[in-house]
Amino acid sequence: MLQQQESPIPRLGVGEEGVVGRHVFGEVWGVNDKLLQDDEYLKNLVIKAAEVANMHLVDVKVWRFGGGDKGGVSVIALVLESHIAIHTWPAYNYATIDVYTCGEHSRPWDAYDYIIKQLNPKTFTKTIVDRSSK
């Protein structure tokens, strides 16, 4: 039978015993649609968020999806520690944000908070999950 365990957040001090995984993700509503369509702005936002969170950037890719007023942008930053992703739906003033890191030295919540501050949504969610192996 599958057992659910309570998990302290953030979980520190596990480095030598196993994988330290920290996952921060959520959604934003009420963001300026022009920001959510601006792939260069979003790319630079993710780069700066990685820096703020003490992550080591490997590469950033940007994709535009759809067309017209319903087209969105996806930005994925590969960082040595894992990834940062933003997916936008400008027609709905909506986006999702995902920051996942492995290791004890990075601070994914700082990256998430930086992105939120820069996007300035009317409302947002923030979920922090400990994804450590022990």
Curated annotation (Swiss-Prot):
**Presence of the UniProt keyword Coiled coil in the record:** no
- Please list the coiled coil stretches: none
Q: In which pathway does it act?
A: Amine and polyamine biosynthesis; agmatine biosynthesis; agmatine from L-arginine: step 1/1
Source taxon at top rank = Archaea
Cofactor(s) needed by this chain: pyruvate
Molecular function (GO) terms listed? adenosylmethionine decarboxylase activity; arginine decarboxylase activity
Keyword Lyase present in the record's keywords: the answer is yes
Residues annotated with Pyruvic acid (Ser) modification: S82
- Catalytic site residues? S82 (schiff-base intermediate with substrate), H87 (proton acceptor), C102 (proton donor)
Q: Which reaction does it catalyse?
A: L-arginine + H(+) = agmatine + CO2
User: Which InterPro entries is this protein grouped with?
Assistant: AdoMetDC_fam_prok, ArgDC, S-AdoMet_deCO2ase_core, S-AdoMet_deCOase_pro-enz
Cofactor comment: Binds 1 pyruvoyl group covalently per subunit.
Q: What is its EC number?
A: 4.1.1.19
Instruction: Give any single GO term for biological process.
Output: arginine catabolic process
| Entry-linked Gene3D superfamilies | S-adenosylmethionine decarboxylase (3.60.90.10)
Q: Which UniProt keywords apply?
A: Autocatalytic cleavage, Decarboxylase, Lyase, Polyamine biosynthesis, Pyruvate, Schiff base, Zymogen
Record's Gene Ontology CC terms?
cytosol
The residues annotated as site (Cleavage (non-hydrolytic)) are E81, S82
Record note on modification: Is synthesized initially as an inactive proenzyme. Formation of the active enzyme involves a self-maturation process in which the active site pyruvoyl group is generated from an internal serine residue via an autocatalytic post-translational modification. Two non-identical subunits are generated from the proenzyme in this reaction, and the pyruvate is formed at the N-terminus of the alpha chain, which is derived from the carboxyl end of the proenzyme.
HAMAP family, per this entry?
A: AdoMetDC_1 (MF_00464), ArgDC (MF_01298)
**What is the similarity comment for this entry?**
Belongs to the prokaryotic AdoMetDC family. Type 1 subfamily.
Protein function: Specifically catalyzes the decarboxylation of L-arginine to agmatine. Has no S-adenosylmethionine decarboxylase (AdoMetDC) activity.
Q: How does it assemble?
A: Heterooctamer of four alpha and four beta chains arranged as a tetramer of alpha/beta heterodimers.
Give the protein's recorded name.
Arginine decarboxylase proenzyme
Species annotation: Caldivirga maquilingensis (strain ATCC 700844 / DSM 13496 / JCM 10307 / IC-167)
